[in-house]
Amino acid sequence: MRVAITGATGFTGGHTLKELVASGHEPVAFVRSRSKLDAVIKLHKLPNIEYVEGDITSRESLRPLLKDCDAVIHTAAVAATGKKAVPLIKKVNAVGSRNVLELSTEAHLDPIIYVSSQSVLHPPPGGFYTDECPISPLPIDEYARSKAEGEFVARKLQGEGHPVVIIWPSGIIGPDDVGVSVAAKGIARLLKAPIIPLPKTGGILMHDVRDLATVLSRCLVANKGPRKYGVFGHYLDWPETEIFLESVTG
């Protein structure tokens, strides 16, 4: 398939580009910077990748990306923290996602893959994540709130019969990132503390970015209609997380 991919220079996007090329697909990257795409190509040892420069919040700049493509994978998102980042988080994750999803349905792409977040489902009814989970009425932070806004659009389009595929990743970790992921920054902060300040209840879900890239690639099957999949990975409670971090860092 000829596949448009947003967020192509990000952590998930870079690994997804690699997986798409390995699987015989033809990716078209949507980027803000050619130089960062060059860095991703070098890091993952990829051939030259076709690309379109633009701004995800501009519907007009997205149209050339989607033209002549068969499918789209929407990985672009802002996962920053702090009050100063809130306007950008809302603009990219909510407005940008609406733009990609609606324009992709207008272009009759199949499938239309939306990378959401496990955080939009938390806490799950009954304590278990399933494909029947509703969007949480109490988002845990502004990031989750913005991703939920995007997922409301995705679910609406699913209800209308459009071939939208919703993917829920949890904490994404792994190698080969041109930057430093939010999960990696969080782990680094913990490791710098004299005593790891973890609560004694609850825990964390994490998975390898390469597994997510594989899932996204394998979802590129047309004529299967709306779908939802969780990529939740492995659960460690906080005491187990502390033991694990100590074991790998000494």
Question: What are these language model-derived features?
Answer:
Residues 152-176:
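Conserved beta-loop-beta element that borders a ligand/cofactor-binding pocket
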Residues 215-250:
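Mid/C-terminal beta-alpha module of Rossmann-like enzyme folds, strongest
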